[in-house]
């Protein structure tokens, strides 16, 4: 018999990886440093950032070269996102941190679960904040965020910028009578401007329709979201102790034009290869389609039974035999 010892969604502090890039890009959009068509030269997929190499997943193929912000998100370019954040916030990292906090991504939700964890976002005044911290933070490292917080952030994007506290119980009833109700609690009434919201919603939709997150999509409805693939840290032992382990994820919502559901899939892969789009995205797609199918209704008036089908003319033959067959089929 197997059972979960703890609720991973609320207690698992993890480095979110590329799902965090959405927050980074939103901060830069909100500060008006960039637009979706802002161009970045990602070169051959490798760039030295303060003594350490930042790599794109396809660096061995020559990288992506010059691409705009939308394409950066579609292909989840580490070089693209980190170059933007390092360029505009390198001299003032606190401005970037303030932008994240403005969106309430780290605000404690106080959900009431045993072992509930809260996000940890490193600040420039802290002991271990180095020159490399900002660019690596922008792509989802050096930051610890429980899955429920990441999902709540994407849900706010889907909810027109309104961040609400996750609610697991709407009301308590006894003998058919409601004895207690739990109203919706607003965490942040507006995580960003309408302009930024419209831009990031458009970007996240394209990430699925024409980016690496295509496996998360559906032919039945539109999906928006972002993939994530992060190496799992073994604490003081680093990222490669005992072999490289990955956390692949996809966080998004559907249908894109009128969101009803948000969902996050996280899978820990003991060994490579790992792909947030292919592995977590495919699971997301199956979950989304099953949920969507539960709310499909057919108009009874449009449903046809066998007696409503137009019967073709009877071929030439014996009239009595044809009449006998038709009568037994209840066809007049």
Predicted features and spans:
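Beta-lactam-recognizing serine transpeptidase/beta-lactamase-like catalytic domain environment
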Residues: 1-18, 23-267
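Generic structural signal of hydrophobic/aromatic residues within well-ordered alpha-helices
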Residues: 84, 96, 200, 321-325, ...
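Alpha-helical protein-protein interaction elements
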Residues: 128, 213, 242-246, 276, ...
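Short, gly/Ser/Thr-rich active-site loops of penicillin-recognizing serine hydrolases
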Residues: 178-180, 184, 278-331
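A short, polar/proline- and glycine-enriched secondary-structure boundary/capping micro-motif
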Residues: 190-193, 273-277
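Short beta-strands and strand-coil junctions in structured, solvent-facing domains, enriched
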Residues: 271-273, 293
